[in-house]
Amino acid sequence: MTVNTFDPSKASPVTHASDSASKTPEPNAVAAPSSELGNRVGFVSLGCPKALVDSERILTQLKLDGYDVVPSYNDADVVVVNTCGFIDSAKQESLDAIGEAMKENGKVIVTGCMGKGNDAQVIKETYPNVLSVTGPAAYEEVMGAVHGYIPPKKEHNPLIDLVPPQGVKLTPRHYAYLKISEGCNHRCTFCIIPDMRGDLVSRPIGDVLGEAERLVAAGTKEILVISQDTSAYGVDVKYRTGFWQGRPVKTRMLEMCEALGELGAWVRLHYVYPYPHVDNVIPLMAEGKILPYLDIPFQHASPQVLKNMRRPAHQEKTLERLAKWREMCPELVLRSTFVVGFPGETEQDFQILLDWLQEAQLDRVGCFEYSPVEGAKANALPNHVPDEVKRERWERFMETQQAISAAKLKQKVGYEMDVIIDSIDGDIATGRTYADAPEIDGVVTFSGAAGMKVGEFSAVEITGSDDYDLTGIAVEDEQ
């Protein structure tokens, strides 16, 4: 389990492993030195990067209001648990985390994706003594609950107890997630995100770019743009014109990327649907203004399965679009996620997916066996796939993609690539190229890192590869 420890003297947390579940709130607990009883908050953050950003915002407000965020249940006057409710296993993990916090501390405020609808009722019935239950992005409600149980310090002076301009971050200093919108307009049958987070609500473009600017000024080298549907950014406000640095900027994906490309950091796009207007962003990648990297949730390739999922079912056109993008930007890296064993998926449907995968030649791929989610419309579909068939198809899928990945990485051997360093152990460093997002993609492990620092870039000669990762040697600076 990973514990993120917040040090107020730094702009971001230091990550270390914890071997004591009873000592530290899990699984992503945030800790800070504390000097005063009666004003201490424990924090447990679960779920995806979008939930992580929610946690960062709550933690920032806690610090602004003068609270200390502490590393142990025993030291906390109250514990906030930010839950995940995307799939049933995540819900169980959230319930377990709430249960542990109740057992170890007893004073618990619950928020996040499980804090809405039927799931909220389950929490209240399972743990009737929780102090408060609120849904995702309910920042004011969470702070109100904290204030109600532990009033802020009367003597707190925000001019003395400084919070970094970029706020509290749970990621290492050199990269950060930038959430550009909340909610989703899609109604996929396997997903309950719209039920939890509502329809798409885009953040004002000035707020998005202002946050990015503060992050870069604080030392962030890589910005990971996230949302439920990045390519739909601004559609809810009809691409309204906002302002940044005194100039007009449309609330739209293209203009956002153009502006982010001016900041001098790596800009990585996640959760991009392959709409036609994404074509306009590819030239920015070819020109080096943003990273030539797209994370696209294809989910499947069979027209029938996609129809059952209520997803776009024109994979032939998608292949044409991918070919067009690669022609415009040969360095383009594509990552995606897929679901196998969706209700009604036949062997023929699965073979269509494997054939499509071979033709698409994606660089990075994740795959999940379909898992029922309470409240999802897919639960009512006929012909659910047996667990053993889902597992067998998952293994065949991963074997197919593993071969594609290995072949693509082998082609990089002998080339020199820029690597951003994530960790260093003596002379050995681990980092990522532009082709790899943190935590979900591959890494580059290279020697010759003595004297280097985490967050720096290093030119690395690639000397080896396996199915997912690269190895290399740092290229000495000739100057």
UniProtKB/Swiss-Prot annotation:
Pfam families noted in UniProt: Radical_SAM (PF04055), TRAM_2 (PF18693), UPF0004 (PF00919)
Compartments (UniProt record): Cytoplasm
Note on how the cofactor is bound: Binds 2 [4Fe-4S] clusters. One cluster is coordinated with 3 cysteines and an exchangeable S-adenosyl-L-methionine.
UniProt keyword terms in alphabetical order: 4Fe-4S, Cytoplasm, Iron, Iron-sulfur, Metal-binding, S-adenosyl-L-methionine, Transferase
TRAM domain: residues covered: 410-476
Transmembrane segments: none
The enzyme's E.C. designation: 2.8.4.4
Catalytic function, reaction form: L-aspartate(89)-[ribosomal protein uS12]-hydrogen + (sulfur carrier)-SH + AH2 + 2 S-adenosyl-L-methionine = 3-methylsulfanyl-L-aspartate(89)-[ribosomal protein uS12]-hydrogen + (sulfur carrier)-H + 5'-deoxyadenosine + L-methionine + A + S-adenosyl-L-homocysteine + 2 H(+)
One of the record's GO molecular function terms: protein methylthiotransferase activity
Biased composition (Polar residues): 15-25
Principal localisation: cytoplasm
Cofactor(s) this protein cannot do without: [4Fe-4S] cluster
GO cellular component term of the entry, any: cytosol
Domain of life: Bacteria
Region of interest (Disordered), residue spans: 1-34
BP terms from Gene Ontology: tRNA modification
Broad enzyme group: transferase
Residues annotated as binding [4Fe-4S] cluster 1: 48, 84, 113
Stretches assigned to coiled coil: none
Domain Radical SAM core: 170-407
Domain MTTase N-terminal: from-to ranges: 39-151
Signal peptide region: none
Similarity section: Belongs to the methylthiotransferase family. RimO subfamily.
Function: Catalyzes the methylthiolation of an aspartic acid residue of ribosomal protein uS12.
Protein name, per record: Ribosomal protein uS12 methylthiotransferase RimO
Organism of origin: Saccharophagus degradans (strain 2-40 / ATCC 43961 / DSM 17024)
